[in-house]
Amino acid sequence: MGYRFQPSSRHFVGTVEQKHRELLHNQIQNVYHLFDVSVSRMITRRWTVNASLPVFLAYRNQLYVPRGEFRVRSIGDVTVGGRAWIFRPPTESGANIGLGLNLKLPTGKYNALGVATDRNGNVIVATADQSIQAGDGGTGFSVDVQAYRPFYGRTMLYFSGTYLFNPRNTNGVSTFRTRRGEQVMSVADQYLARGGVSRALPKFRHITVTFGGRIEGVPVRDLIGRSDGFRRPGYAISLDPGFMVAYKGSVFSCNVPFAVERNRRRSVTDIANGTHGDAAFADYALILGFSRSF
C-alpha cells in the first residue's frame, strides 16, 4: 500500500514562476491525498500479476469564477496487469530488468461537482477543476520498466519508468472555460521516470538509503489518438532522497522528492489560440509505502 501527500500553489508559465500571484494573494491552492492499495501474486520466479485500487482525496480553493472551495473524495482508476523479469531471479550478476503491462479502467470519478458562485454572486453547482478529479474517464494502458544492478560494494543502481497511454480524446465533461477548444476536458497521457543509487547501511543492516532524480508530467500531445480539449501539459524534475526499512518480509519506504525545475508547456489549444496557460506546481511531495510478503 502507498500514500502520497502533495500541496501545490506556485504558478508557472513555461519555466517562469508567476510570483505576482502570491503577492496579489490570488494563487490557487491544491492539496492531494492519494492512498493506494495493491496486491500482487508471484506466478513463477519471473512472472507476477497485480492489481491496484487508489483512493483519492483533494481540495482546491478556486479564486476565479466559478469561485469556491472544491473537495473531491472518490476511488481512482483501477489498474490490473502483470510483470515479467527478463532474467530468471536470482541472477548471477545480481542485476535484472523487469517489463510490465497494465490495463487502466475508468473507475474514478471524473465529473465531480462542487458548490461555487458565478460572476453575479449567485450560488451554483459547478464542475471541479480537472486537476482534482479522481479519474480521467478513459480506458488506457501503461507500460513500465524496472531495472537494477550492483555498482560498488553495498551500492545499487536503480531505474523505473512508466508511460500511461490514454487513447480517448476528451471525456465530455464541461469545463468553466470559454476559450476556443477548452470547453471539455482532455484525456491525457502521463509519464514518470526515476533513477538513482541506493546503499545499504553497514551498521544498520535493515536500512537502505536512496538518492536520485525523477521527472513526471503530462505531454502536449498523446502518442495514440487526438489531444483536443483542455489540459495542462508540462513536467516537474525533482531530486528524490529517501530510505527503506526491510524486516522479516515487511518493507517500509519513504521518499520526499522536491522540485528543481517546473515547466508548464503550451497545450494544443494554447498553440491554436496564441496563448500560454499557467499551472500550479508542488514544491515537494511526501511518498510513503509499505509492503508485506506472505
Predicted regions and their residues:
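Outer membrane beta-barrel transmembrane domains
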Residues: 12-22, 168-294
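Transmembrane beta-strands of outer-membrane beta-barrel proteins
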Residues: 1, 49-51, 80, 95-101, ...
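Surface-exposed strand-loop-strand hairpins of Gram-negative outer-membrane beta-barrel proteins
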Residues: 5-34, 131
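Short loop/turn motifs that connect adjacent beta-strands in outer-membrane beta-barrel proteins
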Residues: 8-10, 46, 87-97, 112, ...
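Outer-membrane pore/translocation modules
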Residues: 57-186
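Long, hydrophobic/aromatic-enriched structural stretches that serve as scaffold segments
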Residues: 23-85
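Transmembrane beta-strands of outer-membrane beta-barrel pores
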Residues: 3-9, 55-59, 86, 103-109, ...
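Hydrophobic, lipid-facing positions within transmembrane beta-strands of outer-membrane proteins
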Residues: 33-37, 76-82, 97, 139-145, ...
